[in-house]
Amino acid sequence: MILTFKYRIKDATVGKYLDRHSRSVNAVWNHCVSVQRSIERRYIATGLKERWPTHFDLVKIATGYAATLELHSDTVSQICKQFVISRNAARHAPRFRASGGPKRALGWLPFIKRAVKLDGAHVVYRKRKFHFWKSRDIPDAIKTGCFTQDARDRWYVCFQCEVPDDLPTGNGEIGIDLGLKTLATCSNGDTIPALQHYRQFEAALAVQQRAGNKRRVKAIHAKIANVRKDQLHKASTKIARENQLIVVGNVSAAQLAKTRMAKSVLDASWSMLRNMLEYKASRHRARFIEADERWTSQACSDCGAVSGPKGIAQLGIRHWVCSDCGCSHDRDVNAARNILFVGAERRPPVEEIPAL
């Protein structure tokens, strides 16, 4: 599989060179946008359909940009390639990338393996060395990469490398019920606590926002993101190592983000956890399944009878007893067990689903 290895550029003084290169990247990107929009304007004016420019068409049109803007020719090719991918995947045409102002695009400088040279903890691009913190070894099978900039104007170098999918995995099977009070409850009774990272720093963030200290506001937001990703990485790695089957409920964060629970839902980062579990399961050669979680919290995981608490009014009931078999359940653990049953296709979570 393809993994991205990200390292922070160590020498802050080279930022001006990367800033200059990123402005050149924006110039090539904006030229591609101009070509695309000129075709659209001609179609509106004349009604004659023209073929959209392909990757090779854009590279041919951008001939000479590499020498003029001091970019590697493969960088120009990668920009054109990414433009075509974005145009075909997005609902709207790609927009111009601003190099300045409040809505400027963050720096981005793509390359392929032959455009750079690795020298220990240095990467050489167009005869200039960029020193980075080499926190872990870089695999030899580098495919592509890029220099990227974050909101705090810090630069990173990223390498996309091909790594084998042969990490050892356990023999367990686990179902995971995502929630807000507890971030994730597993079918074996384990839980991942909801640490509410944003709420922990909310007061400090409000103070700096009122003071107009943009630098500290960016630093606090970065701290929140780093702490959140650290927790999710540790939890997802542990689950992927110990289980050969991982089943997660398909709760929609996008829909719940439109409700009054939006802050808690976005702070929980369910989608990020699911994505981590998916690619880590693939690397450990485990199965990852998103299961339909309807009725899983109301159905008894022992007999399948729908006798659990229903609706928002009974959401506060965390423990209940099945009226059919008399089994006592923790609401979230019971839901996680039913999610595992659905994903493993051993039996339906309920015997009879009542008609709506």
Give the location of each predicted region.
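Nucleic-acid substrate recognition interfaces
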Residues: 1-356
